[in-house]
Amino acid sequence: MLARNLLTDDGVIFMSIDDNERDNLEKLGAEIFGESNYVATFPWRKRTAKSDVPFGVSQDYEWIVCFAKTSKFIARTTGTERKYFETEDYPHQPWRIHDLTTQRTAAERPNSAFTMVNPKTGKEYPVNPLRTWAVTKETFAQYYAEGKIVFPDDYPFLNISKPAFRYWKSDDMKKAGEMFGLMPVSTKLPDNIGMSLDGTKEITDIFDGKVFSYPKTVELISFFIDIISKIDKEAIVLDFFSGSATTAHAVMQLNAKDGGHRKFVMVQLPEPCDEKSEAYKAGYKTICDIGKERIRRAGEKIKQEDDCWKCVPLNRMDGSKPGDDTTAKIVKTIDAGDGKPSIEMVDISKNPDVGFRVFKLDDTNMKDVYYSAEEYSQTNLEDLESNIKEDRTDLDLLFGCLLDWGLPLSMPYRSEKIGNCTVHTYAPGDAALNVPDALIACFDSNVPENVIKEIAKRKPRRAVFRDSSFASSPEKINVFEIFKLYAPDTDVKVI
């Protein structure tokens, strides 16, 4: 139920299972998501046949069951582009042809059962009584005048024997919208998906050792992410059982490939590694440690791959050179064939985003300060001076506030000194574009008025302090008055 509630209306869930529990999983999925939202079950061949198996039958497949939250989900993949023609009579208007007949008989559609005549040549094309024309005798002239009917003699290169419909590419694009060029997905997975051994090889190559057994391949996970995010390349991908973080690897690799901005959320219990395993000996105490390190190493590998760089001429059309870009980085020069260096590999855009943050679930930052009267004593009054737990850092408090305000945890932040106080700015804005900072926080004790004024003058959307930032109640009240003066629209909070 949690997974369903987290999905967007066009969201989808993929669940991997073996033969033993496939039936039960599909029944459970139908109960939670509804039978009508069952999408498909994809068979993934995870290994080659084994010989020492019960009944002499090797169960080589794993099943990936897919359910959608609603009928708004549509899977799409890149297909072979339709063949369009461009001719002199219709310059810059690509077109294609389509069958001009229907499955209706002459008895069913008598008004479409007529002999079609080419107005240019007078050649006749009798109707097939079992497949009448898609136009009527009355509408034929209009369709022909609009250029929507093509005869065999019009374009010999078509090699057709009967009239055909002409469809314009512009109409196809208008009708399909953002789905243009995409096609439905088959449950037959592509040949490059690989098996479990390929997944093991991938992670072994990354770590120079076998630190995780039988992970799924990056290509397998990439395939599923790709078919659900062909249109929405800013989708959020959540993996409840992230393991070695193959999903994170796949998201970063796919983003680098198609320029997407997909985000990943990996969830994993800190399951300890076997002390006899290679992973433990290599210093990875938990599966989480393996996943974090894989994301780091995979990210660095992706940044180094040539696919992340673009080829541009040494002398660009605008007259600038690659070195003119402040972000440009020349990687190598390519010989174009004449012995002269004519192309360089230059980074002309941002590097792939391979950053990530690690969070550990914990209880609240606040102390349990609700005591009954008999629980109070002179000895525990000192413990009640602060309502925040002693082991909490500024970042603990900052990200706790983000959760309270419902802000995303993936935005950039910076810390700086204003006077002697540490001030944190989360999701910095842009003064030139009149975009305010999302949040400014200061959790120091006894924050002076000049620091508060400086924060207020920046007019952030939100500002937060801790109770101990002020020596007295009047000072706390003064903070709100300062913001009313300098930044009346700022939401101020004291924790």
Q: Language-model segments: what does each one mean?
A:
Residues 388-406, 410, 463, 473:
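Glycine- and aromatic-enriched alpha-helical transmembrane segments of multi-pass membrane proteins
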